[in-house]
């Protein structure tokens, strides 16, 4: 490690979520500019539901790394916005399945374009090779630290 030097402030900025926070702020701003009233957190839930509709809140927690109270709050807000509905599982009445509404489904194309555009803005000036290395480093950090 002695010969390896790194920018400790940059490392902790990444690990503390500052990069993620900056991208989320930009994404939220870009959504609002296009008239889409969702947060980046809500978008990650929609993303999971666009991939597989009708999943449990626990599945959404696992997919988004959110705790149960945070997920409940997010889904409550998304129900008020008519983006999702909770329906009791026919096999297990104690479990609610979360489904997209028509409004939630209609956001997929436009919001995905905005997310891709935001990501392109964030990655401006970064080569494909740098991206591959960065992804691999972050993947290893995640693997080393996940519970």
Named regions from a protein language model:
Residues 21, 25-70:
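N-terminal helix-turn-helix DNA-binding core of bacterial DNA-binding proteins
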Residues 76-136:
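Charged, amphipathic alpha-helical coiled-coil/dimerization segments
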């Amino acid at each position: 490690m002695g010969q390896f030097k790194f920018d400790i402030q940059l490392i902790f900025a990444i690990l503390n979520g500052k990069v993620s926070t900056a991208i989320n702020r930009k994404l939220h701003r870009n959504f609002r500019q296009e008239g889409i009233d969702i947060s980046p957190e809500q978008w990650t839930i929609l993303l999971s539901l666009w991939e597989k509709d009708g999943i449990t809140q626990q599945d959404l927690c696992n997919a988004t790394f959110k705790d149960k109270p945070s997920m409940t709050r997010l889904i409550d807000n998304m129900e008020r916005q008519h983006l999702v509905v909770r329906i009791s599982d026919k096999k297990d009445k104690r479990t609610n399945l979360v489904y997209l509404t028509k409004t939630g489904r209609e956001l997929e194309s436009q919001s995905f374009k905005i997310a891709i555009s935001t990501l392109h803005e964030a990655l401006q000036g970064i080569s494909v090779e740098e991206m591959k290395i960065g992804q691999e480093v972050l993947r290893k950090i995640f693997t080393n630290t996940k519970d």
